[in-house]
């Protein structure tokens, strides 16, 4: 009577998914292209069982974030805005000044902007670790180099 067919939808639970760790070297790569590759892994779009409303992606470690490149004149002209939440408290930084002050911030801002807004995006962003140098402190996770 209740015949099982191949048309049944398979639902994957996030707790049953084994998350892998990946290392991406951002040295001499373009900022946006690195961010796109990272977001695909964080969201889990490289897996056959991708589900948009669940955290089924993997963890990502980025090294050499301070050596990321931009095209054109964006190095001097690209602006990042922040606000102190006081009247008249709008501040702007160029890519150059922001990367001198916080070397990992431009890459983190680009990735955060590509993730979904809300609780899912905040949880996905926690799966990202960014290091400005060529060494990272997560060797115990045995990350796969991409």
From Swiss-Prot:
GO terms for cellular component: cytosolic large ribosomal subunit. Keywords: Ribonucleoprotein, Ribosomal protein. Pfam families: Ribosomal_L13 (PF00572). This is Large ribosomal subunit protein uL13. GO terms for biological process: negative regulation of translation; translation. GO terms for molecular function: mRNA binding; structural constituent of ribosome. Part of the 50S ribosomal subunit.
């Amino acid at each position: 009577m209740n015949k099982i067919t191949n048309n049944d939808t398979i639902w994957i639970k996030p707790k049953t998914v084994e998350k892998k760790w990946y290392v991406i070297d951002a040295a001499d790569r373009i900022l946006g292209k690195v961010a796109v590759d990272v977001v695909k892994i964080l969201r889990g779009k490289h897996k056959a069982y991708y589900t948009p409303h669940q955290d089924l992606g993997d963890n990502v470690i980025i090294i050499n974030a301070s050596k990321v490149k931009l095209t054109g004149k964006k190095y001097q002209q690209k602006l990042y805005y922040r606000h102190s939440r006081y009247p008249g408290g709008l501040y702007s930084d160029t890519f150059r000044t922001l990367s001198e002050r916080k070397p990992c911030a431009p890459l983190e801002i680009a990735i955060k902007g590509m993730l979904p807004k809300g609780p899912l995006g905040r949880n996905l962003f926690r799966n990202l670790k960014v290091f400005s140098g060529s060494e990272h402190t997560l060797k115990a996770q045995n990350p796969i180099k991409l």
